[in-house]
């Protein structure tokens, strides 16, 4: 009789355990520390990513896995030191092609784009002879996605400064970034007045600052024409959401023209910093082998 009771108790225990099953992962990204997926099949997904003197010290094997895992339609890169190394990397990533400019010998700007979803119509640089505001000339990419045209303007602004705009010093870092914004605004309003424009990159300054030393006022003063899609991050920065966490700074930005306001809203106003270090399972490993910047991405619908 005791053996029968034991068998019954074991059966009851097994039934209870099997009924519990596995926890259902409602949001895989929050539960899987290696998940860095950003893009969807129904949106135009654009990312900016400073790769910190690529390929110096870069874990190429990991980076070649991370890029398709992000699942962006276009990624704009900064700090590409070796043209051939970047092109070789692109050749090893299925379904992606590369554009790298030659306007500078180092700290180049570049793009990777998904050839299944994006067509590149044209690529060119502007302000090549204006190195004071633009130590790296802006790199434009004219693309078609879902039968619509878009203009991306990839930038890497002058770094450093002291949170003071000295208009009397032509080499003042903040003044140079301020001039870069003013000239980009002029170029867009003059040459691309009705285009869907995305200005993005490592802009090396913060957008949520007092007017007296905010270098982005030429854009911020025109809310009917421009919007920084990452502004919610900038006004509430934390270690977990900024693009440059080592100094708790958010300096990588995505600006859209008013032709994209509805598309941004239609995609849920979704712009965020991608915690790419999750792929490496630690910030220190990521910072040492990939970059000291996190990628920032935006979704647009059509």
Where are these regions (language model features)?
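Bacterial N-terminal signal peptides that target proteins for export
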Residues: 1-8
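Bacterial N-terminal signal peptides
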Residues: 9-18
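N-terminal, active-site-proximal structural segment of metallo-dependent hydrolase catalytic domains
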Residues: 20-97, 103-108, 178-185, 196, ...
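Metal-dependent phosphoester-hydrolase catalytic domains
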Residues: 22, 27-32, 124-125, 131-135, ...
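Extracellular structured ligand-interaction cores
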Residues: 43-48, 72, 107-109, 115, ...
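Hydrophobic pocket-lining residues within nucleotide cofactor-binding pockets
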Residues: 51-54, 80, 125, 157, ...
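Extracytoplasmic, non-cytosolic globular domains
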Residues: 59-75, 136-239
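Structured beta-strand-rich core segments of catalytic domains in phosphoester-bond hydrolases
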Residues: 80-158
């Amino acid at each position: 009789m005791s053996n029968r009771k034991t068998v019954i108790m074991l059966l009851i225990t097994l039934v209870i355990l099997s009924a519990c099953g596995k926890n259902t992962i409602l949001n895989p990204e929050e539960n899987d520390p290696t998940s860095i997926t950003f893009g969807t099949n129904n949106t135009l997904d654009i990312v900016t990513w400073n790769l910190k003197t690529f390929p110096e010290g870069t874990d190429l094997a990991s980076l070649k896995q991370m890029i398709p895992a992000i699942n962006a339609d276009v990624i704009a890169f900064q700090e590409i030191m070796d043209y051939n190394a970047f092109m070789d990397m692109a050749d090893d990533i299925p379904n992606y092609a590369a554009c790298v400019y030659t306007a500078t010998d180092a700290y180049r700007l570049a793009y990777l784009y998904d050839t299944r979803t994006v067509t590149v119509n044209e690529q060119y640089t502007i302000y090549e002879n204006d190195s004071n505001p633009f130590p790296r000339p802006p790199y434009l990419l004219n693309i078609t996605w879902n039968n619509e045209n878009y203009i991306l303007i990839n930038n890497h602004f002058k770094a450093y400064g002291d949170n003071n705009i000295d208009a009397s010093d032509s080499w003042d870092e903040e003044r140079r970034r301020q001039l870069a914004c003013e000239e980009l605004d002029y170029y867009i309003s003059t040459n691309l007045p009705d285009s869907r424009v995305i200005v993005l990159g490592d802009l090396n300054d913060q957008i949520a600052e007092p007017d007296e030393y905010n270098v982005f006022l030429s854009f911020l003063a025109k809310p009917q024409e421009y919007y920084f899609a990452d502004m919610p991050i900038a006004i509430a920065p934390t270690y977990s959401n900024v693009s440059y966490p080592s100094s708790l700074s958010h300096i990588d930005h995505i600006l859209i023209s008013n032709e994209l306001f509805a598309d941004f809203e239609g995609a849920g106003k979704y712009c965020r910093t991608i915690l790419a270090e999750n792929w490496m399972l630690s910030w220190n490993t990521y910072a040492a082998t990939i970059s000291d910047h996190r990628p920032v991405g935006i979704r647009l619908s059509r």
